[in-house]
Structures are given as structure tokens and as C-alpha cells.
Amino acid sequence: MPWLVLDPEGGPVEPIRRYLYDFSARNRPGSVRSYAYGLLRWWRWLRAVGVQWDKASPAEVRDLVLWLRAAEKPRNSPRRTSAATAGKFNPITRKRNLGDGYEPRTVRHSNSVVRSFYEFWIEIGEGPLLNPVPLDRRGRRPHAHHNPLEPFRAEGKIRYNPKVPRSRPREIPDEHWKDLFGAMRSNRDRAILALDISCAARASEILGICGVDVDWGDQLVRVRRKGNDAEQWLPASPESFVWLRLYLAELGPLDLNDPVWWTLRRRDHGDGLRRHPMNYDALRAVLRRANKLLGTNYTMHDLRHTAALRMSRDESLSLRDVQTILGHAHLSTTADIYLIEDEAQVIRRVAEHLAEREDRARQPLPPVAVGYEAADLAVLFGGLPR
């Protein structure tokens, strides 16, 4: 087992171990890690309130949700420079910085993990009779009005799930993109950003590229999609391949099966002084240095949003094309996120409308025909036309 939850004596918690053993057979290691941490939080909560795991009720789940919404997340080290901006909006990007508390998505994920854990035990007949994470069905039978021509989807949301504020994806403006790209210190970092903003891949997918995954002739890169590990070739811009060529020339010979991205500095982790494959923490450090220099809070996912919004506004690309590049399973996901009216264009049109009203108000009233009183016409028609 790659991940286990241990009790205070150092032994594995048997109910969680059996669940994770079954869960790992059908999910990725990253999902196993995420669920293990979620169950660790739930187990600690049950110990704090003095309730056995198979005696838990919806009251314990409700109280945990209330506690998560009020508590602060534990940190390995205290905040330093980010303490003053935690939870506040950045004036340049207009994005909110992460706060010290648990976000609604974290609470929803916690509820999903606990519900899945009890569904496993109820299914094999060894757990409680009722799942302590109830669904809110609002008094109607699931799939009561299901269309037989459409696939079945899960009905009923978890009762204590908090609502997630819906926000539109933030695009990096062209002038800010130039500043961000100019803040990169190496050809490696420039190649990563240029590649990501042209092919709209996720950060983990970009970092997983190996030498054999680069098609120099057709200017394609092959990524392994998050969730199902499906391989997909994505087109990238000629500029990104220029920066990639410059970086690889500095790196030296690269085996086709080796990762493309390596650390710039050689470090000794017990096997000699050498370079190591670049991981997500190292990539975050690159953006953290650039954000500190520019006073921004951009992330790698902002580059994916920017590329997707650029594609969605291109009349030569269909929504199906954008869905394929982004790797979304459902076309509705792409449409809900990216098929939106440009906020800047809406603001511009409304500003023009307000300015036009001001101009009309300053224009003199048209002359009234001979034989009619202006006051009488105003009463009759509710004001003279402009």
C-alpha cells in the first residue's frame, strides 16, 4: 500500500487500510494519497469527539463541516511575506489569494471521501446501517423523470456540502503576459511557459513529458491526461519549440525515455551530485519568484485558462476543438467554463450606453409643432422624444 493511516501506536488503522486497499485497485496513486489524508482528518475528528467509526451519525459530519468552515489550516511553517495578503484580492490580477481557512472545495472533498468510505463498508455488510454522510434529495425519488435516451447521472447532493462561488476563469492580459514571460530567469522556464500557454495542458501533464514525447517535425508534444493516463498529442507554437531547443542545447544529451525538464542546479541526495527531474514544487517556486518580482499571484493553471479563452474566441475553432485540446470528458464542461461573454467587452458596451444617454440628455429639445403646448404633450406622451 503506498499510503496508510496509522494509529497512535504506529499500526495501520484497519478499517481505513481495507478501504484504501480496495480503492487503490481502481484509482491513481494521487487519488489514494488524497483520500488517505481525508480519512486521516475524519479519524482524528472521531477521536476528538469520542465516537467509534461505525457509530458515527450525520451529527458528527455536520459538526466537522462547521469546524472546517471556522478553523485555520495547520501549516508546516508560519507565513512570512504572504501573511499580509492572505485571503485578499491582488490589485493587478484581481484574483483572490488563498486564505488561512479551508476552502469550500476542500470541505466538499472531505464529505465525498467520508461518504465513499462508508459506502464501501455498507456494501460488504460490515459497516453501519446508514451512511453518516446523507444526501439531500429534496423529497423526490432519484431518476424519477429520467430521459431514457440520456445516460444516468448521480442525483442528490451531499446535504452538508457548502456552495462554491462560481467565478469566471481569469485570463492573463497580453501586456501582463509579456511581463511574466520576461521575469523568467532561464530558457527552461521560458520553454515551459511558452509551451503551456500554446497547448493548454495542465502543469502535471507538461512536467510528465519525456524526450520521446516531442515531435519536432510536426511541432507536437504528447501528454498523459490527468485522471485516465490517456495519451494525446497536442500542437504547440513555433516559439515554444525555439525555447525548448535552446534549453535542451544547454542541458546536453537527453535519452528519449528521460524526462525533458530537469533542475538547473545539481544536488546530492545520497547518490552523488547531479541534476534531478523537475517536480511541481520546483515549478511553483519559479512562479513564486516571478510573482514576487511583479506583485502578482499567477499560477500555471492561469496559463491553461488563457490558452483556452484565446481558442474559444477564435472563429476558426469550434467548441469541440477546444474540448479536445483541453481533454474535457464532456462538451458541457468546456461550454460552462469558457463559452462566456467577455467581461471586458460587456463593460465597454455598457459604458458606451451610459455615455450615449448623457449625450442625449445634453441635446436641446426638438421644437414643438405650432398650435401645441409642450407641457400638454409631456403629460399625454410621458415626455417628448429625443
What are these regions (language model features)?
Residues I16-S31, L40-E150, D179:
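N-terminal core-binding DNA-recognition domain of tyrosine recombinases/integrases
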Residues L234, R284-T324, I340:
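Short, basic (Lys/Arg/His-rich) helix/loop patches that form interaction surfaces
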